[in-house]
Amino acid sequence: THPGAKLNFMGNEIGQFIEWRYYESIQWFLTEEYETHKHHQAFIKALNHLYTAEPALYERGYTDDGFTWIDADNSKQSIVSFVRQGEDIDDDLVILINFDPASYESFRVGVPREGDWDVIFDSDRPEFGGSGYAGEEPYTCSSEPYPWNGQMDSIEIKVPGLAGVVLKRRGPSSYKPPVVEE
């Protein structure tokens, strides 16, 4: 999800044990014999689909206005977050990457716009060999008018350990402020 072209060497799409050899074919049998290779192939396939389906990942991949940090300095939890911008503001994506094995049931992150944000990709999904910490089904996070990370609005999201999560704004926030009784 970081800007720039992606390079994946032959055989990496299945997590091949050995480096590709010009005199041999890729070891496709690994995806049939080992579940981890099958999971890795499903992960790369989903990443490729995400990359081609989301203009924010390629339209401004080589310009400064295609990438904005939300939080690059979270050393306590080792989670970085950023926005990838496309030509259309409705294509913008919020990305969180957790570089630590700790998972978080409720992690607050600033978002560039108010709204309901759908999780459109989670690298911790069971079909990729992950734990499914955030649940089996995609889910939505509604922004609150609670400033965080230099943004006017924020969301709370489940963040799996050692995983990446991609969110896309679906529409206006369905957040309802709590009713204060007097």
Model-flagged regions — what are they?
Residues T1-N8, N12-E182:
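Carbohydrate-interacting/catalytic domains
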